[in-house]
Amino acid sequence: MGRAFEYRRASKEARWDKMSKLFPKLAKAIQVAAKEGGIDPDMNPKLRSAIATAKANNMPKDNIDAAIKRASGKDSADIKNIHYEGKAAHGALVIVECMSDNPTRTVANVKAIFSKNGGEVLQNGSLGFMFTRKAVFHLEKFAGDLEELELDLIDAGFEELEQNEEELVISGDYTAFGELSSAIEAKGLVLKKAGLEYIPNNPVSFSKEQLSDIEKLLDKLEDDDDVQAVYTNID
């Protein structure tokens, strides 16, 4: 499906200091979801998905509970969703999603990462027509009939399904996230990660040498504590 953040998955996970950097990012996602939609997972599909993603990455229950508790506290940090658009080397397009309690720090860091690694930050909205926002669910492989599964999910906003050797990926319109999430849960599918992702409308292929240049920027972005997701138009 040409989505970034999934491409180079194995090498990226090896780079990402695994738990030391991943857990704070997962906790931040839980905290934001809980603050936006309430602390009851049964009534908040985004929180359910954030918790499921954390569990799939072996985040301890105590950490998950603490993140939810922070969201309901009177003195909880005001964490904002921040979105940046830019270009990497060789014209690769990049969308960066952050969660931060200090936007001034975050924008300075993101701009510095782009400028020091052959890229540039663009005005927000510049890449809107190049990507489509989708509700995307990454699940354990499904052993049943995929065509039957599609029929069962179509009324919930299902649009596309793809299964490879590692996982099943289901996507739909971003406005159908809650309904599609409930339908997937009802089917008993095992969730690994879910959220709203930016899918490139026209993925572009790059040579190995070009990808090496582009990855220098992507690596630095993914290592930043405030960055939650990075999407590109790389095929």
From Swiss-Prot:
Pfam families found in the cross-reference section: TACO1_YebC_N, Transcrip_reg
Principal location: cytoplasm
Keyword annotations of the record: Cytoplasm, DNA-binding, Transcription, Transcription regulation
Keyword Acyltransferase: no
Gene Ontology molecular-function annotations: DNA binding
Lineage top rank: taxon: Bacteria
Subcellular location as annotated: Cytoplasm
Coiled-coil region list: none
GO CC terms, sorted: cytosol
Any one biological process term the GO annotation gives: regulation of DNA-templated transcription
Keyword Transcription (UniProt): yes
Transmembrane segments: none
Alphabetized HAMAP family for the sequence: Transcrip_reg_TACO1
Similarity comment: family membership: Belongs to the TACO1 family.
Protein's name in the database: Probable transcriptional regulatory protein JJD26997_0557
